[in-house]
């Protein structure tokens, strides 16, 4: 009986592991990059915004979903979206395709899970270049996709490490 219980427990752990792995895989396939942060949510947001500014880019705004939920009497763990970009780079594509403005500027999400762990999630450069831009009839040269991906990685690393 004890062996049966151990086997059931092991099977349950394996199933949970597979579900988590599948969820992470789906997120990666959908162009999302998620990095764990070594800092509380508020500090991760501040570090991300400082990293954006250090690259000469602009932080346009924050959307604090937890604060909005609180205003209507609901509780939510931290969920803050940061809109950031570089008008020198982003304006021309939006002039060519007005609908790009629904997806631009890029966004980062700082969020806390049920265990209190903080994460930073953003669209990969590859996703932006191969999915977002073509969705609006635009193309992004492979070198620009690569450079954007590296920039986003650098920003995320500066915020989370």
Feature-to-residue mapping (PLM):
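N-terminal secretory signal peptides that target proteins for export/translocation
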Residues: 1-5
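Bacterial N-terminal signal peptides
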Residues: 9-21
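Sec/Tat signal peptide C-region and signal peptidase I cleavage site
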Residues: 21-27
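Terminal, regulation- and interaction-focused segments at domain boundaries
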Residues: 27-58, 157-161
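Extracytoplasmic/secreted envelope proteins and their assembly/folding machinery
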Residues: 42-45, 49, 66, 145, ...
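Compact, glycine-rich, soluble single-domain proteins
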Residues: 49, 53, 57-60, 64-106, ...
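Beta-strand/loop substructures that line and gate deep hydrophobic ligand-binding cavities in soluble
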Residues: 108-138
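C-terminal partner/receptor-binding element of secreted or periplasmic proteins
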Residues: 126-161
